[in-house]
C-alpha cells in the first residue's frame, strides 16, 4: 500500500472542505524526524497565502475536516502551519499482516504503461569498458522496478552497429580470414579494432578498399552485410557473457542497433524539408532551432544530412524516437545516456516534437548520469592510463571478494566459496554505483565497496542473512506463524513497521525518477532500524508467545523486503554468509 498517497487524498479533501481550490497540493511527505510524526502535510502555507489567511488558522480548519480515523492516532499543528501525522499502531499492525499475506508484500499495481528503456548501448567490434557500467546497471534497476510494478517494459539496447568504421573493420576481417586467423583475431576485439585502425592509417591501398566497402555495405550488398553481421554477432556474444556476469536482464533479443533505423532516414529528411523545418545550407540539410542559439546569438543549425549525403547521429535519434512511439507504441521513453549527450538529445527531441512524430503526452526522458572517477578524482583508468575493460573489472571484483570471503569463512567448501564470492563481488560493484545519486560523478573505491559496514552490498547482504538467522535459531517455519496477530506496542516496533510499509512509496520514486539510490538509502535505513529493534525488543526471549510471534512477523517482513528491494536493484542474496 502507498500510505503517502492515502494521506495525500485525505488531506486534499480536508483542504478543499476548508475552502482551498480543487487543484491544491497537500504536499504530504515522510517526516525527517520521529518527533514530527510519521508524515507531515506542508501544503497549508502555500494555500493560506493564496486565500489571504493566516496559515495556522487554515491548518486548524483543515484539522476540523481531516478524517484519519483508523489511520492516525495523533494529528497536531506545528510551527507556522505544518500538520504532523502519527500513524495508529493498530493500522500499522493490520497492514504488516496484509503485506505478509501477499507475494508482492502489499505493493499495488498502478495503471500499466508501455515503457521503452534505452540502456547499455555498447559499440560493435569494441569490448565493453567501465564507461558502459553505469548505463547498463542503472537502466537495468529501472527496468526491474517498472516490471515489478506491472508495466510492459521494452528494453532497447541501442548498439553502435553502423558507420564508416565498418568498411575498415570488414577489410581487416577479410584480410584475417585470408590468413586463416579470423576467429582468433576477433577473440580480442580491442586488439582487432586497434590493428584495423593501424592498417587504415598506414596503408593507403587498404584505406581505399575500406572506403569502397562502406559504400557497398550501405548499398545493401549481401557479402558485406554477411561480414557485418559476423562482427555484430561476435561482439554481442561477448557482451552477453558480461551481461550474464553482471546479473543484468538484457538479452540478444533486446538489441535495437543504429542500423535498424537506416531505412527511415531518407523519408525523415524529405518529410522535415516538406514541413519547412529543414533547409539546404552550404550543401547540407539543416534544421535551425530558435530554442538554441550559437555564439552570435542566432538560431543554432542542427545538421541532419551532410553534403555527401551521409546521415548523422541526430538523424538516427529522430528516427529512433519516432519508431518507439509509432511502432513500439510507447507511453513513455527513458534514455540512460551520460550527461555529455544532453544537448544533443534535447535538440533531436525538439525536432521530433516540431515534426509531430511524438506527441507531448508521451514523455521522452533523459535520465543522465555522471562519471566514474578514480581516487585521484579523474576519470577511472588503468595504472597505465588506458580504458578499464568491464570484464577485467569484474575479474578483479571476484578475486578481491574471494579473498575477503575466504578470510571470514576458512572452513567453507570451494563451491560455496566461489558462489559467495560471485554474489558479494558483483553485488559490491553494482551497489557502489547504484547507491550514489546517478546525476553526480562518483569515486570508485574497492575498499569502501567491499566493506561490511556502511551503505554497501556486503553490509546489506549480511543484514539479510542476519534476519534469517533469527528463524534458524528459533527453529520455526515462517508458515507456522500465519495466524499469529501482529501487535505494535513499543516505539521501535512502530518505527520499523512504518518504514516497512513505505516500500511501495520507495518503488514509486524509483519508477518515476529513475533513481535507484533512493531504494539503496531506504534498504540501508531499514537494516539500521531492524538492528535497533533487534537490540531493544527481545524476539526469542520475549515475555509472551504472542509478543514473540508478533516480533518474528516483523522480522519476516524485514527479510522479505530486503530481498525484494535488492532484487529490484539486480543484487543477489544468499541465506548464509
Curated annotation (Swiss-Prot):
Q: What is its EC number?
A: 6.1.1.19
Kindly list the places in or outside the cell where this protein is found, as annotated in its UniProt entry.
Answer: Cytoplasm
- Which InterPro entries does the entry mention? aa-tRNA-synth_I_CS, Arg-tRNA-ligase, Arg-tRNA-synth_N, Arg-tRNA-synth_N_sf, ArgRS_core, DALR_anticod-bd, Rossmann-like_a/b/a_fold, tRNAsynth_Ia_anticodon-bd
Major localisation: cytoplasm
Which terms does the UniProt entry file under GO BP?
Answer: arginyl-tRNA aminoacylation
Q: Where is this motif: 'HIGH' region?
A: 122-132
User: Which GO CC terms are listed, alphabetically?
Assistant: cytoplasm
**What's in the keyword line of the UniProt record?**
Aminoacyl-tRNA synthetase, ATP-binding, Cytoplasm, Ligase, Nucleotide-binding, Protein biosynthesis
User: One MF term from GO for this chain?
Assistant: ATP binding
Gene3D superfamilies of this UniProt entry? Arginyl tRNA synthetase N-terminal domain, HUPs, Isoleucyl-tRNA Synthetase, Domain 1
PANTHER family in alphabetical order: ARGININE--TRNA LIGASE, CYTOPLASMIC, ARGINYL-TRNA SYNTHETASE
Query: What protein name applies here?
Result: Arginine--tRNA ligase
Origin organism is Klebsiella pneumoniae (strain 342)
Taxonomy, top ranks, is: Bacteria, Pseudomonadati, Pseudomonadota, Gammaproteobacteria, Enterobacterales
Query: Gene behind this chain?
Result: argS
Amino acid at each position: 500500500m502507498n500510505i503517502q498517497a492515502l494521506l495525500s487524498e485525505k488531506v486534499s479533501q480536508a483542504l478543499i472542505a476548508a475552502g482551498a481550490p480543487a487543484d491544491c497540493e497537500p504536499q504530504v511527505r515522510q517526516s525527517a524526524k520521529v518527533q514530527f510524526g510519521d508524515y507531515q502535510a506542508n501544503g497549508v502555507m502555500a494555500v493560506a497565502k493564496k486565500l489571504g489567511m493566516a496559515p495556522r488558522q487554515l491548518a486548524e480548519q483543515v484539522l476540523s475536516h481531516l478524517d484519519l480515523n483508523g489511520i492516525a492516532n495523533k494529528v497536531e499543528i506545528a510551527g507556522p502551519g505544518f500538520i504532523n501525522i502519527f500513524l495508529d499502531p493498530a493500522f500499522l499492525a493490520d497492514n504488516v499482516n496484509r503485506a505478509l499475506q501477499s507475494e508482492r508484500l502489499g505493493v499495488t499495481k498502478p495503471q500499466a504503461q508501455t515503457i521503452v528503456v534505452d540502456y547499455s548501448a555498447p559499440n560493435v567490434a569494441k569490448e565493453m569498458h567501465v564507461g558502459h557500467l553505469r548505463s547498463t546497471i542503472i537502466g537495468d534497476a529501472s527496468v526491474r522496478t517498472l516490471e515489478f510494478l506491472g508495466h510492459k517494459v521494452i528494453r532497447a539496447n541501442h548498439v553502435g552497429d553502423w558507420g564508416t568504421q565498418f568498411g575498415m573493420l570488414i577489410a581487416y576481417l577479410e584480410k584475417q580470414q585470408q590468413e586463416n586467423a579470423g576467429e582468433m583475431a576477433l577473440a580480442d576485439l580491442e586488439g582487432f579494432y586497434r590493428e584495423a585502425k593501424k592498417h587504415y592509417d598506414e596503408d593507403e591501398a587498404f584505406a581505399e578498399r575500406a572506403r569502397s566497402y562502406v559504400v557497398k555495405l550501405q548499398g545493401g550488398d549481401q557479402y558485406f552485410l554477411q561480414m557485418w553481421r559476423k562482427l555484430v554477432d561476435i561482439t554481442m556474444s561477448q557482451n552477453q557473457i558480461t551481461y550474464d556476469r553482471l546479473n543484468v536482464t538484457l538479452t540478444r533479443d533486446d538489441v535495437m542497433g543504429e542500423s535498424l533505423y537506416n531505412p527511415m532516414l531518407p523519408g525523415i529528411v524529405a518529410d522535415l524539408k516538406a514541413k519547412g523545418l529543414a533547409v539546404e545550407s552550404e550543401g547540407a540539410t539543416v534544421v535551425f532551432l530558435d530554442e538554441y542559439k550559437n555564439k552570435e546569438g542566432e538560431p543554432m543549425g542542427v545538421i541532419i544530412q551532410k553534403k555527401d549525403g551521409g546521415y548523422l547521429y541526430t538523424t538516427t535519434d529522430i528516427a529512433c524516437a519516432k519508431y518507439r512511439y509509432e511502432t513500439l507504441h510507447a507511453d513513455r521513453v527513458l534514455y540512460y545516456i551520460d550527461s555529455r549527450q544532453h544537448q544533443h538529445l534535447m535538440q533531436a527531441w525538439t525536432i521530433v516534437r516540431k515534426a509531430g512524430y511524438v506527441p507531448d503526452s508521451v514523455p521522452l526522458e533523459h535520465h543522465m548520469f555522471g562519471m566514474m572517477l578514480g581516487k585521484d578524482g579523474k576519470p577511472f583508468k588503468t595504472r597505465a592510463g588506458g580504458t578499464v575493460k568491464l570484464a577485467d573489472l569484474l575479474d578483479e571484483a571476484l578475486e578481491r571478494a574471494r579473498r575477503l570471503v575466504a578470510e571470514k569463512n576458512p572452513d567453507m567448501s570451494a563451491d560455496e566459496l566461489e558462489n559467495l564470492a560471485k554474489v558479494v563481488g558483483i553485488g559490491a560493484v553494482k551497489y557502489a554505483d547504484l547507491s550514489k545519486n546517478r546525476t553526480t560523478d562518483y569515486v570508485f573505491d574497492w575498499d569502501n565497496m567491499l566493506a561490511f559496514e556502511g551503505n554497501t552490498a556486503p553490509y546489506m547482504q549480511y543484514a539479510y542473512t542476519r534476519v534469517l538467522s533469527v528463524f534458524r535459531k528459533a527453529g520455526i517455519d515462517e508458515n507456522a506463524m500465519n495466524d499469529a496477530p501482529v501487535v505494535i506496542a513499543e516505539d521501535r516496533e512502530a518505527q520499523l513497521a512504518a518504514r516497512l510499509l513505505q516500500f511501495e512509496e520507495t518503488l514509486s520514486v524509483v519508477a518515476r525518477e529513475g533513481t535507484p539510490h533512493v531504494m539503496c538509502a531506504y534498504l540501508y535505513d531499514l537494516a539500521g532500524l531492524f538492528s535497533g529493534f533487534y537490540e531493544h525488543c527481545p524476539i526469542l526471549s520475549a515475555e509472551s508467545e504472542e509478543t514473540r510471534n508478533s516480533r518474528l512477523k516483523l522480522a519476516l517482513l524485514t527479510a522479505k523486503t530486503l530481498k525484494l528491494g535488492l532484487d529490484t536493484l539486480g543484487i543477489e542474496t544468499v541465506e548464509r554468509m
